[in-house]
Amino acid sequence: MIIAGRCICCDGDRLRKSPAVLMPFVAKRVFDWEPVEITPDWGMQTLSPGMAYPLCNSIQCTDCGALFLDMRFDEAEMGRLYSGYRDPTYTAARERFEPGYAARNLMLSERAAYLSEVEAIIGPYLSKPLHVLDWGGDTGLNTPFLHRAESVSVYDISGLAVAEGITAVDRCGLASAPFTLVVCSNVLEHVPSPAALLGDIASVMRPDSLLYLEVPLEAYVAENAGAENLATGKKHWHEHINFFTETALRALVARCGLKIVHLETLETEIYGRLGRQFCLLCARV
């Protein structure tokens, strides 16, 4: 783990920070840390009794508005956090800290209905034959054009088995296949270096390939649009360690040698909850 000293999107150094806590499930999964109660019998001279949780900082870039956790997990830590993502072992561990998670997780076993809206947004820009790579696509259940593309491949660190009809690829296989559409949907909010990830993706894109990016417009950001003090109100961090603004996304994409072909904010129902998603279609410069 390293502590961020620059913006994860625009690479600026004009940052504001405020204390927060790392949620117990993430702390346990990544660092094997447990919450602990400080009691009077500890005999502490300068600490007050009460529950102790892992401390961190919320950081906001004053240039692009990106809001993020200061902790940037390394490859091994990310592996511990996402290995077997949402499988029975993962779900049981998370249920211990977050009662009700297992029930919510059951809903995610079905393909998301809003994907038809995503396909309608990006479909007009695509040409055939369509070969799709879903980068960070889990099992491939929610890959756009799943049943309409000539081929669908998934690259994911979870190690989960992919859905029928999908090919799982490793890093070596990424460079050898002629992908016309690369999808990176609901991934950038999880990763320690969005810029590094986009650089990796750009390296496997052909000159005529398109990249579809999708990230949440988090409610806290949407409800406080334009605010420069978001760090003070963001008191906890879970698996979404990056909160994006449109300005931040534009800066990130440009920094990574990509250009935006289409950008819109989709407001729709996602697994029973109303949500907002940034939807970007990008090409190499």
Predicted regions: what they are:
Residues 1-185, 194-198, 212, 228-232, ...:
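Conserved N-terminal segment of class I S-adenosyl-L-methionine
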Residues 201:
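Class I S-adenosylmethionine-dependent transferase superfamily signal
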Residues 5, 239-242, 246-256, 260-285:
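Rossmann-like AdoMet/SAM-dependent catalytic core
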Residues 186, 190, 240:
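Histidine-centered divalent metal-coordination motifs
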